[in-house]
UniProtKB/Swiss-Prot annotation:
Full protein name: Autophagic-related protein 16.1
Keywords in alphabetical order: Autophagy, Cytoplasm, Repeat, WD repeat
Matching PROSITE patterns: WD_REPEATS_1, WD_REPEATS_2, WD_REPEATS_REGION
Gene source species: Caenorhabditis elegans
Source taxon at top rank: Eukaryota
Entry-linked PANTHER family: AUTOPHAGY PROTEIN 16-LIKE (PTHR19878), AUTOPHAGY-RELATED 16, ISOFORM F (PTHR19878:SF8)
GO molecular function: protein-membrane adaptor activity
Lineage: Eukaryota, Metazoa, Ecdysozoa, Nematoda, Chromadorea
Coiled coil regions, renumbered to chain: none
């Protein structure tokens, strides 16, 4: 039985030897021991049968047998250890094989992705070529369209020049019509003067003495007879097709109106409760908002809702220039120093214009809608003021871009008017109050208000009388309030026949007579 096990072990070791060379030495040693053991076994059997062996030899053989068994045990242990190592090696080999399989799968996946990427790259190259072709075609189209735009722009400029020429021709025709009307009017006046002179037999010496005793004149050169508080309506003039935004005396007998009908009309008072239109200034494409007059050069300036400022020569009613540059309606304009003007707009920009060169010399950015401007301040010829929607009164020096002083008011500032001395400024605000500010200290000197007084609009205009004795303002209910400048006492409340809001007032340079314009095309002379 032991021999069969031994043979089985030897056969398995032989098989392991063939598969693994690392156990060859172990196998050889075990084979030798097995052969020696078998020889001893045979030798021991033959000796027992012959009974001739000596007892000492048998003991030696037993000792060798014991030694062989010990060697066998050691070799068996080594075999077990070798089997364990073989098992470990097989596990590691299996892990390596599994890892190899995984790596091969990963390699196949990477190769597939690479092939897919190659296909995608090829597709992108094709798309890129197509896009490049489209880009070239687009550039060609853009070049062609740019040329077309340039041609259209050239045509637009040509048409604008043509329109300008036609407008100039239209203005020339209007000027010719005005000149003809002026000539006819002068002829009628000359006939009237000739007829009147024939009835005069002697001079009124008393009147001459009275006029010599009154040498005072206002800043416009008109004889200042003294401020008089008006009490009645001399006449009511229906002059525009809509709102009359501004009215302005040019001298003691002539005044101008401007509003929604896009024309400025010049009127003359005959002194007997009547009036005559003596001229028309045209050229605007929208309603006029503010007008101003420079008597020395007979220049008339007006701001308009068509974003422009225009200047006329009043002698021949000829349009001298159109000042463009604002991006929104121009709310106000005033002559400023010599050969300059200041305009304010809803685009939150103040522009100083060089009238001679017909260009903007400086732009100021107060960051708020401009509602009115005031010039001719006595403190400095270059100083001017602007009233704004953000309730701030800003003072500028035309030589710099930042305000030199800012005064906070109680409401949106609708109107500014400077006293004859240039030392005080009248300010109207939407909180239904009017303030008189000392320009030397920038402090409020007087405040004017009344129970029924309501500021009519953001562009309503208040005025000082020619002699600076009174303050006048129009209300939203159609009434006109007159205060004493120094005492702030309400001297008079003039009530019109309608309840249309009063937009603008202008006091006659002689101090006798107040013009008012309303929302519904009416102008009233109060005396």
């Amino acid at each position: 039985m032991a021999d069969s096990y031994r043979k089985l072990i030897i056969e398995r070791l032989e098989d392991v030897k063939q598969r693994n060379k690392q156990t060859a030495t172990l196998y050889n040693n075990y084979s030798k021991l097995a052969e020696q053991l078998e020889k001893k076994h045979k030798y021991g059997t033959s000796s027992s049968n012959s009974s001739q062996l000596e007892t000492g030899e048998l003991a030696r053989v037993k000792e060798e047998m014991a030694e062989l068994y010990r060697s066998k045990c050691q070799n068996d242990q080594r075999l077990i250890d070798a089997n364990h190592r073989i098992a470990d090696f097989e596990k590691k080999s299996s892990a390596i094989i599994a890892e190899k399989i995984a790596l091969e799968a990963t390699a196949k996946s990477i190769c597939a992705k690479y092939a897919k990427t190659e296909v995608e790259l090829q597709r992108l190259k094709v798309d890129n070529d197509q896009l490049n072709d489209e880009r070239i075609a687009s550039n060609t189209t853009v070049t062609m369209l740019t040329k077309q735009i340039q041609d259209i722009e050239n045509d637009r400029i040509h048409f604008l020049n043509k329109i300008r020429e036609l407008n100039e021709q239209r203005v020339d025709f209007l000027n010719a019509e005005v000149a003809l009307e002026e000539k006819r009017r002068n002829s009628r006046i000359q006939d009237m003067i000739t007829s009147a002179v024939q009835d005069i037999t002697d001079k009124d010496t008393k009147l001459e003495e009275m006029l010599r005793a009154m040498p005072d004149t206002n800043s416009n050169g008109d004889l200042l007879l003294g401020d008089s508080v008006p009490s009645r309506a001399e006449f009511v003039l229906e002059c525009e097709e809509g709102e009359v935004n501004d009215v302005h005396w040019l001298d003691g007998e002539t005044f101008a109106t401007g509003g929604s009908d896009r024309n400025i009309k010049i009127w003359k008072v005959d002194g007997h409760g009547g009036y005559t239109r003596i001229g028309t200034l045209a050229g605007s494409n929208a309603a006029f908002t503010r007008i101003d007059y420079e008597r020395d050069r007979k220049h008339f300036i007006a701001s308009s809702n068509d974003k422009n400022v225009r200047i006329w020569n009043l002698d021949n009613s000829r349009l001298l220039s159109t000042l463009s540059g604002h991006s929104d309606q121009v709310t106000c304009v005033k002559f400023y120093q010599s050969h300059s003007a200041v305009s304010g707009s809803a685009d939150r920009v103040i522009k100083i214009w060089d009238i001679q060169n017909q260009r903007c010399s400086r732009s100021l950015f107060p960051a708020s809608k401009v509602l009115d401007v005031a010039t001719n301040m006595g403190a400095s010829p270059s100083l001017f003021a602007s009233g704004h929607f953000d309730k701030k009164l800003r003072f500028y020096d035309g030589r710099s871009t930042d305000p030199v002083r800012t005064v906070d008011m109680g409401g949106r500032i609708t109107s500014l008017d400077v006293t004859m001395s240039g030392c005080e400024l009248l300010v109207s605000t939407r909180d239904d109050t009017i303030s008189l500010i000392d320009l030397r200290t920038f402090q409020t000197v007087h405040c004017y208000s009344a129970e029924n007084y309501r500021t009519s609009s953001d562009l309503s205009r208040v005025v000082l009388s020619s002699g600076n004795e009174y303050v006048a303002a129009g209300s939203s209910n159609g009434s006109i309030f007159v205060w004493n400048r120094n005492s702030t006492k309400l001297e008079k409340q003039l009530c019109s026949n309608s309840e249309n809001a009063i937009f603008s007032l202008s006091w006659n340079p002689t101090g006798y007579g107040l013009l008012s314009s309303s929302k519904q095309k009416f102008v009233t002379l109060w005396k």
